[in-house]
Amino acid sequence: MDKEDLKRQAAARALEEVRSGMKLGLGTGSTARHFVELLGEKVRGGLDVIGVPTSEVTRADAERCGIRLTTLDEIDRLDLTVDGADEVDTRLELIKGGGGALLREKIVAAASDRMIVIADESKWVDCLGKFPLPVEVIPFGLAATRRAIEKAFTQVGAAGQLKLRDGEAGHAFVTDGGHWIVDAHLGRIPDAPRLAKLLSEIPGVVEHGLFIGIASTVVLAGTEGIRTVERA
Ligand SMILES: O=C(CO)[C@H](O)[C@H](O)COP(=O)(O)O
């Protein structure tokens, strides 16, 4: 079974949690896209839901699939967000933002009663940090912001290279919010909750890819089957 099959299986399991009338956060990335496609099939079969997309790419996918969309300005809370992740640890702390949508993903997940993370089992780790940690930054004063980010890493005993994410034609990658992303190649993040707090205090940092205490459930699809882990 290839990875896309596993991602789709995880997405299908999460879909079992969706009921008519729900307001849903729609994640970004290849695994979340499977969920959007499967949800679209249900919607075409009569399921009545409304979604808030976490990126322009997901907005386009959802529209193509016939899913009704709204915004967080028009509705209050969401019942459920289903999204992928780049890494998940045993405390259900996440690294997200490989696809560059971390800011909207975090806003949407935080506005949801539940967040289900869907992933293939390769995303499950003992310690976060092998996947480069995305940090969304304001272009103004980038060098100063980078220094502050590096200081935060030192404070938690982490170290590694910070690389500005490349976009098209030699330009920096630009997020849906018009910001840049620096990816931190740390290898290991010893204290993710503390690092999350420190990064949030840096003025030039818009958001970071550490999702702490946000995911309620992780659905992991592997060759042995599907495993569901709930946050303690
Ligand atoms: O955080 C994300 C996008 O910003 C994605 O959820 C994350 O990168 C996982 O993507 P994929 O399902 O393609 O592995």
Curated annotation (Swiss-Prot):
<comment type="similarity">
    <text>Belongs to the ribose 5-phosphate isomerase family.</text>
</comment>
<dbReference type="Pfam" id="PF06026">
    <property type="entry name" value="Rib_5-P_isom_A"/>
</dbReference>
<feature type="binding site">
    <location>
        <begin position="28"/>
        <end position="31"/>
    </location>
    <ligand>
        <name>substrate</name>
    </ligand>
</feature>
<dbReference type="GO" id="GO:0009052">
    <property type="term" value="P:pentose-phosphate shunt, non-oxidative branch"/>
</dbReference>
<comment type="subunit">
    <text>Homodimer.</text>
</comment>
<dbReference type="GO" id="GO:0004751">
    <property type="term" value="F:ribose-5-phosphate isomerase activity"/>
</dbReference>
<protein>
    <recommendedName>
        <fullName>Ribose-5-phosphate isomerase A</fullName>
        <ecNumber>5.3.1.6</ecNumber>
    </recommendedName>
</protein>
<feature type="binding site">
    <location>
        <begin position="96"/>
        <end position="99"/>
    </location>
    <ligand>
        <name>substrate</name>
    </ligand>
</feature>
<dbReference type="InterPro" id="IPR050262">
    <property type="entry name" value="Ribose-5P_isomerase"/>
</dbReference>
<feature type="binding site">
    <location>
        <begin position="83"/>
        <end position="86"/>
    </location>
    <ligand>
        <name>substrate</name>
    </ligand>
</feature>
<keyword id="KW-0413">Isomerase</keyword>
<feature type="active site" description="Proton acceptor">
    <location>
        <position position="105"/>
    </location>
</feature>
<comment type="function">
    <text>Catalyzes the reversible conversion of ribose-5-phosphate to ribulose 5-phosphate.</text>
</comment>
<feature type="binding site">
    <location>
        <position position="123"/>
    </location>
    <ligand>
        <name>substrate</name>
    </ligand>
</feature>
<dbReference type="InterPro" id="IPR020672">
    <property type="entry name" value="Ribose5P_isomerase_typA_subgr"/>
</dbReference>
<comment type="pathway">
    <text>Carbohydrate degradation; pentose phosphate pathway; D-ribose 5-phosphate from D-ribulose 5-phosphate (non-oxidative stage): step 1/1.</text>
</comment>
<dbReference type="InterPro" id="IPR004788">
    <property type="entry name" value="Ribose5P_isomerase_type_A"/>
</dbReference>
<dbReference type="InterPro" id="IPR037171">
    <property type="entry name" value="NagB/RpiA_transferase-like"/>
</dbReference>
